[in-house]
């Protein structure tokens, strides 16, 4: 949490932090594969978006990428902290309205590669690696490569289960077993299922007098979460209590 420039609730922060700690013992610079999925359409949710009419794009994109609907935030936040409008939906709608992306998939890839990617996963990995003096470079985000990929027809990127054109270029240069293996993630079970000492730390943070004085979260919601910390999940499958706890821990760490 100390290494985070801003609150980062993704489970993989812990994994990247520990991995960077180990890798930094022998090297100072690593190459990261970040950006390949966003630039070359590697994620599983891109093929369904390719079938969505352009005018329906913002609503369908929001279903995939909006972790907490505005209505749910109204059940979590105290009224003084809740905005009347839905800034997430407005942001997506405005971006999709920008000219230059002919299809829903093109608009989604543009948003992901120019905004979501650099403001979330790239920033996460940069924070976790630099905490150990490790520099992570991102060759898939070379601007000329990104521009070339943006001009590539969507069907070529979606081929072969995603990142099709990239896989074809790599074939013969990279072992097939690497190219065709199932996609891997960095799961952190302790953050998905809160119990024991870790749950105690979460409870201490959200019930701290500083948190109560802040008055960010509704007491009824918080009490329900602490009574049953592992049932409630966000749209994207994260532990709902952990996200609130991480925010509170980060604020307390910064003396805010």
Could you say what each language-model-derived stretch is?
Residues 1, 43-44, 190-193:
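Short secondary-structure transition/capping segments
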Residues 1-18, 45-55, 151-156:
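ATP-dependent adenylate-handling ligase core
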Residues 17, 21, 168:
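Active-site phosphate/pyrophosphate- and oxyanion-stabilizing loops and adjacent acidic/basic residues
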Residues 25, 29, 58-256:
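Adenosyl-5′-phosphate
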Residues 27-43:
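Short acidic/histidine-rich active-site segments
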Residues 39-65:
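A mobile, often basic/glycine-rich helix-loop segment
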């Amino acid at each position: 949490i100390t290494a985070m420039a801003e609150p980062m609730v993704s489970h993989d922060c812990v994994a990247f932090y520990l991995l960077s700690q180990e890798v930094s013992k022998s090297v100072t610079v690593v190459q990261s594969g970040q950006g390949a999925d966003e630039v070359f359409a590697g994620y599983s949710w891109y093929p369904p978006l390719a079938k969505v009419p352009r005018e329906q794009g913002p609503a369908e994109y929001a279903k995939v990428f909006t972790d907490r609907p505005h209505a749910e935030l109204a059940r979590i936040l105290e009224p003084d902290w809740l905005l009347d409008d839905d800034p997430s939906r407005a942001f997506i709608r405005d971006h999709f309205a920008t000219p230059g992306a002919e299809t829903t998939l093109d608009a989604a890839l543009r948003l992901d590669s120019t905004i979501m990617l650099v403001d979330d996963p790239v920033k996460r990995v940069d924070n976790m690696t630099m905490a150990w003096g490790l520099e992570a470079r991102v060759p898939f985000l070379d601007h000329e490569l990104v521009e070339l990929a943006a001009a590539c027809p969507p069907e070529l990127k979606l081929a072969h289960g995603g990142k099709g054109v990239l896989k074809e270029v790599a074939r013969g240069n990279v072992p097939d077993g690497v190219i065709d293996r199932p996609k891997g993630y960095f799961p952190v079970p302790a953050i998905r299922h809160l119990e024991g000492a870790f749950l105690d730390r979460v409870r201490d943070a959200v019930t701290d007098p500083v948190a109560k004085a802040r008055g960010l979260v509704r007491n009824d919601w918080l009490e329900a979460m602490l009574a049953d910390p592992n049932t409630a999940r966000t749209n994207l499958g994260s532990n709902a209590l952990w996200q609130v706890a991480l925010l509170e821990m980060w604020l307390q760490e910064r003396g805010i």
